[in-house]
Amino acid sequence: MAGVLGMILAGGEGSRLRPLTESRSKPAVPFGGSYRLIDFALNNFVNADLMRIYVLTQFKSQSLFHHMKKGWNINGITDRFIDPIPAQMRTGKRWYEGTADAIYQNLRFMELSEPEQVCIFGSDHIYKMDIKQMLSFHKEKLAALTVSALRMPLAEASQFGVIEVDAEGRMVGFEEKPSAPKSIPGDPDFALVSMGNYIFEADVLFAELIEDADNENSSHDFGKDIIPKMFPRGDVFVYDFSQNRISGEKAEVYWRDVGTIDAYWQAHMDLLKTDAPFSLYNRKWPLHTYQPPLPPATFTDSDNGRVQIIDSLVCNGSYVRGSRIEKSVLGFRSNIASACDISESILLGDVKVGEGCVLRRVIVDKDVDIAPGTQIGVNLQEDKKIFHVSDDGIVVIPKGARVGY
């Protein structure tokens, strides 16, 4: 769509997702067997035919660059691009100091694109959104800035920017991560929170970024500085994400912050439900990604018993022999020997599980080799001596580990 530029913030360190982010940035973390977190933001743009996109990277970006080079290279098509941009350090030898600073340091790229509107989106949430619908709302309201928002249980709202709106959808209050969030009028158990997705009029954005960069007292963040400064003018509006409609979708809108191990695990379990709230199979909203050239998954019986695959996702290149896999996600090239019992677990790919292993509520990062007869997730006290165990008891095996040898 001419006149619209996408800026995707993909520099997140993802400290709460460690050890999955020890060797990769948060947007590069695998999800759902075949995907990376960045894919969902990119698909929201591409499926809305918004094909001029800069992806701003920062921490441990090599894995992300590799994925985008193989799966998202559309360069060569006139006026269409998806370009990853590493931190430029144009304002000094320093990393991005906040979300607004990340955009400001790439002001030159935006100006060269001559956009009318700039869409600034995050890259670490699981959801589908037709951005054209939000863009139409933005134009109808003649907004300087539009912020997408959703209802959030009041108990969880303090982790987000909390919004107040009037009857016309105009923002009349905003507080970033308040300790005592305000509830929605008439809906006392919920708050209206920012999704961290913004559409700016380009001239307004450029002026705000330049002014903010000159303010020594600013933290250079959209939620902490730019939005609180802008909304009292009356031209900041709020787009209700619950009104967004995706062709071919039956379920209500789905949005998950997967910033913790427990949330990441739960989002995978959501994929495996009979009526999954987030579907990977909507042909009218394809989820593009890089797919390595691999043969189909193979399932064979063994002398130890028949193979059983129940409520699970198994990716190409995987080989499961005479084992039981239930409510689990097996990434590319997962090799499961016979007599294993794996349940409610996530294998990120290139994982070898030896004969007779038991895995319960385990996340296994890439390139892991688990010795025959190993039990993980059965005795959490023992697991804590070796692995990271989350608050909800999810065991995480780090990338490249050799377990039980």
UniProtKB/Swiss-Prot annotation:
Q: Which Gene3D superfamilies match?
A: Hexapeptide repeat proteins, Spore Coat Polysaccharide Biosynthesis Protein SpsA, Chain A
Record keywords: Hydrolase included? no
Q: Which domain of life is it from?
A: Bacteria
Its UniProt entry gives the catalysed reaction(s) as:
alpha-D-glucose 1-phosphate + ATP + H(+) = ADP-alpha-D-glucose + diphosphate
What's in the keyword line of the UniProt record? ATP-binding, Carbohydrate metabolism, Glycogen biosynthesis, Glycogen metabolism, Nucleotide-binding, Nucleotidyltransferase, Transferase
Query: Which pathway is recorded for this entry?
Result: Glycan biosynthesis; glycogen biosynthesis
**InterPro entries tied to this protein:** ADP-Glc_PPase, ADP_Glu_pyroP_CS, GlgC_bac, GlmU/GlgC-like_hexapep, NTP_transferase_dom, Nucleotide-diphossugar_trans, Trimer_LpxA-like_sf
Q: Pfam families from the xrefs?
A: Hexapep_GlmU (PF24894), NTP_transferase (PF00483)
Q: How does it assemble?
A: Homotetramer.
**Protein name, as recorded:** Glucose-1-phosphate adenylyltransferase 1
Taxonomy, top ranks, is:
Bacteria, Pseudomonadati, Pseudomonadota, Gammaproteobacteria, Vibrionales
